């Protein structure tokens, strides 16, 4: 089990879950935490941005600098709503385009258009490759469910419902706050804590009785900003630098797999 480095936590309620006694609900991000779809998102973001940047370079004469699937993904788009990810990355390249509207086609040179182009690419990857569940995450969900804790999935992806259904994870989940929810209820995306706060509200618990599980820097920052009982950072890369970044952004503990908490 992972070592907690905060000395003032109450007695751990169960060696099975590795959580403080006061925790009554678990709020999980989806991509990279429960499912191995983060790699598909990375591929889709890179394919979309590289195509757009190449088109733009040919049109304007600017130098083509491709999207970095490691540095750019984690810094600018991971864990954010699609439109926020598009704005964040383009801003890093000093590129400004109109927002457009949510129903813009993928060919439109707008924030929403590029976001929809990325989503189309993601759907193709999901059809071709499918979404895989991390074995350790499935085992942890089973243990959380057996312990009687509430479970919510909190994701910026608008595809969350479909992924949960196709992977069978929906049987563990009582509440879902995703990209569709954020749009319909006008909830701010991560790193704002609003989506996690909404999930806790739906489960009927206060933030100090809920644990947040995140692999994205924006996600752990959201968990810390919401004053949740504990924020668990998942470092699938295994790199010390990424673990340090997760802690710096608000993770109380960092693991490479949820099974380490069992």
From Swiss-Prot:
Binds 1 magnesium ion per subunit. Shows comparable activity in the presence of Mg(2+), Mn(2+), Co(2+) and Ni(2+). Also shows 60% activity in the presence of Fe(2+). Is not active in the presence of Ca(2+), Ba(2+), Zn(2+) and Cd(2+). It catalyses: beta-D-glucose 1-phosphate = beta-D-glucose 6-phosphate. The modification 4-aspartylphosphate is found at residue 29. Autophosphorylated. The keyword Transcription does not apply. GO terms for molecular function: isomerase activity; metal ion binding. Beta-D-glucose 6-phosphate binds at residues 31, 79, 82, 157, 159. Keywords: Carbohydrate metabolism, Isomerase, Magnesium, Metal-binding, Phosphoprotein. It holds the Pfam family Hydrolase. It comes from the Bacteria. Its cofactor is Mg(2+). InterPro entries: B-phosphoglucomutase_hydrolase (IPR010976), Beta-PGM-like (IPR051600), HAD-like_sf (IPR036412), HAD-SF_hydro_IA (IPR006439), HAD_sf (IPR023214), PGP-like_dom2 (IPR023198). Its EC number is 5.4.2.6. Mg(2+) binds at residues 29, 31, 215. The active site is at residues 29, 31. It is an enzyme of class 5 (isomerase). Belongs to the HAD-like hydrolase superfamily. CbbY/CbbZ/Gph/YieH family. Catalyzes the interconversion of D-glucose 1-phosphate (G1P) and D-glucose 6-phosphate (G6P), forming beta-D-glucose 1,6-(bis)phosphate (beta-G16P) as an intermediate. Does not show phosphatase and pyrophosphatase activity. Is probably one of the key enzymes involved in the metabolism of trehalose, a disaccharide abundantly present in mycobacteria and which plays a crucial role in bacterial physiology and virulence. NCBIfam families: HAD-SF-IA-v3, PGMB-YQAB-SF. Monomer. This is Beta-phosphoglucomutase. It comes from Mycobacterium tuberculosis (strain ATCC 25618 / H37Rv).
